[in-house]
Amino acid sequence: MAQQDVKPTRSELINLKKKIKLSESGHKLLKMKRDGLILEFFKILNEARNVRTELDAAFAKSTEKINLASAVNGMVAVRSTAFTAKESPEIQLSGHNIMGVVVPKISSTGVRKSLYERGYGIIGTNSYIDETADAYEDLVEKIITAAELETTMKRLLDEIEKTKRRVNALEFKVIPELIDTMKYIRFMLEEMERENTFRLKRVKARMRD
């Protein structure tokens, strides 16, 4: 707010005081929101790290199982078995709110399957195929969980940065400028009052003369 654009009046001084009070209140609320978002972010970050560790282990296990199944049954047989599934997994996307930020909720159906649902039956296959299917179903579930957590972290981080910018703008620009303008108006009002007092004294002096 440029000081030269402000009229040095008492009503303007009152308006400025209200703006400062409102800005300070908004600044306090935004700081609380920022701190709350940071706490939520680190809570989810810890969970995401655990899931990422589980995901890496699940990937290593599924790779080991498919290599073993391929060595015993042949890669062609393993691939053929994979295409016999009667139904594909379904992913459902929804959202939920964390301190004003809408983050994804990813749920799935049909990832875990029974032998019947897998479609390849028992005859002509062995436990290596079953263990490979189990391992990859577990891997898919871990991928879904990791995707939800990592997307949530990204959205929270974006909101944290946005809130930090607003906090800093209020703290280092808006509020200081309002306070400086208020001081300027007070100074101008005091000067005007001194001038008026001086004029009044001169008028009284002339009247006495």
Curated annotation (Swiss-Prot):
Single GO MF descriptor: ATP binding
Keywords: ATP synthesis, Cell membrane, Hydrogen ion transport, Ion transport, Membrane, Transport
Gene Ontology cellular-component annotations: plasma membrane
Membrane topology type: Peripheral membrane protein
An individual GO BP term: proton motive force-driven plasma membrane ATP synthesis
Cellular compartment(s): Cell membrane
pH dependence: Optimum pH is 5.2 for ATP hydrolysis.
Xref: InterPro entries: V_ATPase_D
Organism superkingdom: Archaea
Keyword Ion transport: yes
Record's keyword annotation contains Cell membrane: yes
Stored NCBIfam families: PRK00373.1-1, PRK00373.1-4, V_ATPase_subD
UniProt subunit comment: Has multiple subunits, A(3), B(3), C, D, E, F, G, I and K(x); there may be a few other subunits as well.
Family per record: Belongs to the V-ATPase D subunit family.
Other comments on record: This organism has both a Na(+)-translocating F1F0 ATP synthase and this H(+)-translocating A1A0 ATP synthase.
Stated role: Component of the A-type ATP synthase that produces ATP from ADP in the presence of a proton gradient across the membrane.
HAMAP family per record: ATP_synth_D_arch
UniProt protein name: A-type ATP synthase subunit D
Organism for this UniProt entry: Methanosarcina mazei (strain ATCC BAA-159 / DSM 3647 / Goe1 / Go1 / JCM 11833 / OCM 88) (Methanosarcina frisia)
